[in-house]
Amino acid sequence: MKTQIVILFISMIMLQMFVQIEGGFWGSLWEGVKSVVGKRGLRNLDDLDDLDLDHLFDSDVSDADLRLLKQMFR
């Protein structure tokens, strides 16, 4: 009987540790889903589609930058 109680106690501790670790992951995943599926999230995605991607990612690379990159990758 003592062995069963000890095994039960240890398994409960291990289960609690697992739930606490996974709770952060599942919480983050749920927040991401809520932000995408919610009304504001969908509205923000529509606003993102209206923008030109060139405005989001500025790709101004000067000749000096290109020379430096070529030297780095030799």
Curated annotation (Swiss-Prot):
Keywords: Amidation, Antibiotic, Antimicrobial, Cleavage on pair of basic residues, Cytolysis, Hemolysis, Membrane, Secreted, Signal, Target cell membrane, Target membrane, Transmembrane. Residues 1-23 form the signal peptide. The keyword Signal applies. GO terms for cellular component: extracellular region; membrane; other organism cell membrane. It is found in: Secreted; Target cell membrane. One of its GO terms (biological process) is killing of cells of another organism. The keyword Signal applies. The modification Valine amide is found at V37. Residues 41-74 form a propeptide. Expressed by the venom gland. Its main location: secreted. Antimicrobial peptide that is rapidly bactericidal against Gram-positive bacteria (MIC=12.5 ug/ml against S.aureus, and MIC=100 ug/ml against M.luteus). Is also active against clinical antibiotics-resistant bacterial strains. Is highly capable of inhibiting antibiotic-resistant pathogen growth, including methicillin-resistant S.aureus. In vivo, shows high antimicrobial activity on a S.aureus-infected mouse model. Belongs to the non-disulfide-bridged peptide (NDBP) superfamily. Short antimicrobial peptide (group 4) family. This is Amphipathic peptide CT1. It comes from Scorpiops tibetanus (Scorpion).
